[in-house]
């Protein structure tokens, strides 16, 4: 690794590589320190600023250390000890640094996420930009890198990664999200945008598209053309305000980040992968073509490799118990095991005599002292758990051999520390499946187990009920003289079960028979050359794996002495094992590479170290390719202390195959160990290609020795049929031997796949009649029969057809500077399957003192390093606070639990970086719009195929004969006068207050008289003329109704306006002002209270109060009657104006004529069978649409009584509406979605108490949700389910549908069939097609019929582009022809160019005479098998969504609600969601119901679910507080208001993530 002093130097890559090679030669002892210095100075001399002398050229403290001791050199470089030793490799580190240096040239603009201050983990003074009122006046980091632009930092010059801090636009550390934060200067941002737009990396295929497909007809109707897509570079910063289409000022900070993200994504992407994912009936994409240049195996087919003959030595015992008996009786004083305390002093020496007698006691006690004589708890062959801590091998050994003597099967497991340990549940599953009822443990361990208040050991999560039995001598019974264990020769009974944790976290039990146990000990004895009374130092876990096989089993067979070093001692003194080797002159030591690394870190040139006694240093994790550097470094340092090169013996093992291979201790020191430098690129294709160490992406592997004695080994292809590999191919190593496991306990299917494999030759013939066992290790057999392992099957991640090993990715991440960044090297790498491919996720613990800037820079570097070295993208990189990842019992990271937490959104990261744009290369092809087939061809096609044209109509108004007296009158004002004369005391309206009591009521004559007085007031005080417009600003109630009819009596045109909210004047009053101005109201009528509010100081701050028209307060009315009541001269004149703000933020007023108003009321009267004797409960906002008509008009026309319940009253009493419905025994009721939601959420837990209060909904015949959108099935269904117990019939709940051009098209009446639900394929819908599927099929979307078509209404489905009629079940725009259509827009605020053809369109083919109104909604008609009231087949209308809400992405049409539904399902804490697009990026805003710490959990889950279900990449995820997403009175989301708020940086988000 080049010295630190070289970091600032621009050395060519080959020089750096040569330096790395020199470094390696030095570390391997090939050259001396002096030679190294000489060659090094020669190499870099040319690049030093002052050539005269190397010494002078380097600053004193940076001068290369010239010390004879390579040990201290090693120590100085690696003193941190924080990095995970398993993956330490200086060569690899050098490669990573070189790769990053390469990246320096091509800057990568990664927008830094925004965080709310409360969410920033580490608050350090320089981590924040001080709040500043300027809108980005200072240049916070320009691309040129001017001196003042670089962020200040504690380390002075940031030479190595200076670029990243600049590339992250202006946001050195702007982690807060308040609008006062400085945003990047306009110049810098502009330059950056240009740089990014022109950056050319490698000319490969373009990214999946985020910027290419803009919609062909503008999606946001209210935005002028060219407002988003056409601008090449947005205006940033300073005085210029960036604006959205309708002139909303936008914070340059948010927009700059988005622009930066867009520019970053515009760059050509590296992997030239074809998009290959085919998942739709018509998305026929080319199958991914294999890369023609990918390496393929070319060698001959490998031959199975035989190990040496297992020689039967004459004095080998017939079984392990027999060996114990022999040594226990003939050498009882011989030491068997010495345990150490935490000070390194011998704690206990177990002799063979003691082991024999204690094991006998254990065997007798478990067979005879548990349960009763007649019913013993444990019988021979039963399984028992062994639960012993890592510092008590003696107790474990006695219990283990006790079980063998009793012919009971021990199942060693870890000590459970809490009731909810990581992975503990799976251990419980193993114990349950093994039928374990007894657990053997030690006294100390038993005392340390968690206890309940009564002192009992609680049942651990997922565990069976256990009897805990302590195996200390005082708890054991001495066996009687006549009892003796049954010692027989090894047979095929199970000896013990070793647990194994799988990739998915499940725990399996590998059964090892007594024969296999004995044979394995014999094979190890032969391979390692063990002899009697040798001393062995064991640092490994003695309960499983190499530690168990050498330190507990083989040692007893050979009467060896084991010195056991507990983990707790290693933590305190990492050199302890080396000291014990010296102290006891041990011949063998069993360690892991981390123990060697720790010893190196702690080593301080101790004098008394002498390792010449060691003949074998077994490296248990030698199969991990990254262990080689620890081995090399260890040899380098301790060679001078008597350590010989041939002593280091890596081995490979697996729970299933036990020891797979081990390097033999040779006496020939001239034969160097085998090593190979392999191309990582080749390895990803499973091919062995030898490379040179100069290359960046290479993996250096060491051999793990030869095949075990008595075994045969081969390698087979990792997937599919177990076919033999070629000689230059990587495969899964398989072993055929006696000394292996035999099955997974109780799992015959999995056992067959692993333990009964018959490798095949290329011709398909099996190579042996005996089964082989899969080892789970990936590797190959090299020259000379040496076995090499390159990784594990469990760590394999197959991304886009290439195989990557998790360990390799970890090694690269840990080699990224600063190496100390990852806390104690705690990092987890795994893959998650998203959209039919595996995606790499990296989770790391960050140091407690890391700033946001540090984290972000480190993450950016990791992405680049992995991209360079492995040529693979990282899907998600998450950082969590130190010490928060789930741990395994030995302190490692519990991988499957970490993955589980990530997937369920409970990982709580403090930083997240998602890169879906880089990684996801298998999206379906963007839809290419085909040239439209002409409307005539479509019609002919339908006729030929026998499909009817999609048109339908309600009953004909003219043909219905009923005794409708109101029909005689053309105008509603006349109907009211008639009712006041004929039925003066009939109550028309009853208004309820929040307690459910009657607040007010109106009879026909009272309403008539009040209307007269208001008419007088308008004429006398207001001096209004016939046809003047009057704004009615009233709360929902009776005053509003009276004012409306007063206007009609005076000949004025009323406009109902929602009054401003007293607590929120700033945002609600401007809308009132706008409607009053746009409607050209000459006068404003209201109550005294609101009158004061309109002129208050708060109002003056929000609007110009001087420009209000005349304001009349109707609390004080004149006494006299009008001279005459105005009668309109023509039914087509204006009756009233209906103003409403659409969900796209457009204010539109429609004109309703007197004729249309009367026809509307008549249609509803017929559909709902309304008569004077009926009562209808209405809980709706009375300001627009059907809500206004039901509240103000219908009762006067039909004569029924309306019970009015203002929706705002439900906020204080959610049960008000339903209690009123029950109390008045109402049969028909109308509500809005917001009311239904309020009841569902607010009364969910109160149904029992409501039942007790006598709430009864059994009389309800129709409960209609008034809506202008697709029916919300989930809400209506949960409402029906919830109140079913209170008598509500599910069939009663339905929805209506109306829009601006016709306020009510459908409404479920009293007769006719129930609304039907169909399931359509969501993917087909995106292509504007309807494809009906079965319920529950993938990608199915339920659509409920929007009620029944009203009388007098005709509907046709037309193509919105060609205006041609479409066939049945085809998706198109809903066109409507009806007497109650609105007669046109009065004004549209937001888009003046909205054509009049909305109201008078004609079909381009077919019936070209009828005039239709275009609703702007997509839907389809479907003729059902059901029968209508008139005996004909019923036509159902299904509404899909509004055209102007739909988003066109990748050439497909998406309805926001579908994406939002998926996102809300993604995590329990998401309460609401809204999506919109910005510069063709999809922005998802989610409301978080939980702690702010959960905010970042949502980012990956939201990204995943949208990818999986909609094939879209989310560009920005914004996490906000509850209630931030604006919702209008109809319960619809105001997505465009939200969008403007986001871009103006007004949302105060908790977190904003910019996905890369």
Curated annotation (Swiss-Prot):
Positions of transmembrane segments: none
Species: Homo sapiens
InterPro entries: AMP-bd_C (IPR025110), AMP-bd_C_sf (IPR045851), AMP-dep_synth/lig_dom (IPR000873), ANL_N_sf (IPR042099), Dip2-like_dom (IPR037337), DMAP1-bd (IPR010506)
Domain (DMAP1-binding): residue spans on this chain: 7-120
Signal among keywords: no
SUPFAM superfamilies: Acetyl-CoA synthetase-like
Modified sites of kind Phosphothreonine: 264
Entry keyword set: Phosphoprotein
Designated name of the protein: Disco-interacting protein 2 homolog C
Region Disordered, annotated ranges: 47-157, 170-189
Gene3D superfamilies in alphabetical order: 3.30.300.30, N-terminal domain of ligase-like (3.40.50.12780)
Compositionally biased region (Polar residues): 120-136, 144-157
Sequence ranges of Basic and acidic residues compositional bias: 81-93
Presence of keyword Phosphoprotein: yes
Pfam family for this entry, one: AMP-dom_DIP2-like
Similarity annotation: Belongs to the DIP2 family.
Domain of life: Eukaryota
PANTHER family given in the database record: DISCO-INTERACTING PROTEIN 2 DIP2 -RELATED (PTHR22754), DISCO-INTERACTING PROTEIN 2 HOMOLOG C (PTHR22754:SF33)
Cysteine pairings via disulfide bonds: none
Residue ranges, compositional bias (Low complexity): 170-183
Stored SMART domains: DMAP_binding (SM01137)
